Amino acid sequence: MGQEFSWEEAEAAGEIDVAELQEWYKKFVMECPSGTLFMHEFKRFFKVTDDEEASQYVEGMFRAFDKNGDNTIDFLEYVAALNLVLRGTLEHKLKWTFKIYDKDGNGCIDRLELLNIVEGIYQLKKACRRELQTEQGQLLTPEEVVDRIFLLVDENGDGQLSLNEFVEGARRDKWVMKMLQMDMNPSSWLAQQRRKSAMF
């Protein structure tokens, strides 16, 4: 599911100072004494239990962070991911989001891939209905969100979103940006987790 982010993207997001890195390491080791974060722990952080769509979405994020594909997140992968999420530019975050959405890794997002992601996000964001509404306050179904995104972003009408269409569509339209990035509100999520857990 999805592709991995590159170390170059994480590095381009900004440098981490040594003191901050040491603090992250202490917290990581306290929470993950084995030195690795497993899928079930990752899901627990997102409070994902039995919901299939939300579970698939979180698994996609996990795989995007799991650079070497060993089904765990080690400290270096953790740091690279946090650096990208917390400090990355809008373009880096959109590229990373695109890679999560592109489940089959073919470089394009089709309607079914986007629908699966939007359904998962709806499950994760049940309490945040505001984020799922249009400018007029209308709550759209996942299918309506996908239709509207394709209408606004699929420039060549081929039924697939390329990376360029994805990034440019988000830059052009505020609503599209909100919909394409509604999973990428990691700063507030991480702030909540910092209060609840020593992990972050």
From Swiss-Prot:
The N-terminus is blocked. The keyword RNA-binding does not apply. A lipid is attached at residue 2 (N-myristoyl glycine). It is a lipid-anchor. It comes from the Eukaryota. One of its GO terms (biological process) is regulation of signal transduction. In the retina, it is expressed in cone and rod photoreceptor cells. One of its GO terms (cellular component) is ciliary basal body. Gene3D superfamilies: EF-hand. Keywords: Calcium, Cell membrane, Cell projection, Disease variant, Lipoprotein, Membrane, Metal-binding, Myristate, Repeat, Retinitis pigmentosa, Sensory transduction, Vision. Ca(2+) 1 binds at residues 66, 68, 70, 72, 77. It is found in: Cell membrane; Photoreceptor inner segment; Cell projection, Cilium, Photoreceptor outer segment. The keyword Hydrolase does not apply. It is linked to Retinitis pigmentosa 48: A retinal dystrophy belonging to the group of pigmentary retinopathies. Retinitis pigmentosa is characterized by retinal pigment deposits visible on fundus examination and primary loss of rod photoreceptor cells followed by secondary loss of cone photoreceptors. Patients typically have night vision blindness and loss of midperipheral visual field. As their condition progresses, they lose their far peripheral visual field and eventually central vision as well. Binds three calcium ions. Stimulates two retinal guanylyl cyclases (GCs) GUCY2D and GUCY2F when free calcium ions concentration is low, and inhibits GUCY2D and GUCY2F when free calcium ions concentration is elevated. This Ca(2+)-sensitive regulation of GCs is a key event in recovery of the dark state of rod photoreceptors following light exposure. May be involved in cone photoreceptor response and recovery of response in bright light. This is Guanylyl cyclase-activating protein 2. It comes from Homo sapiens (Human).
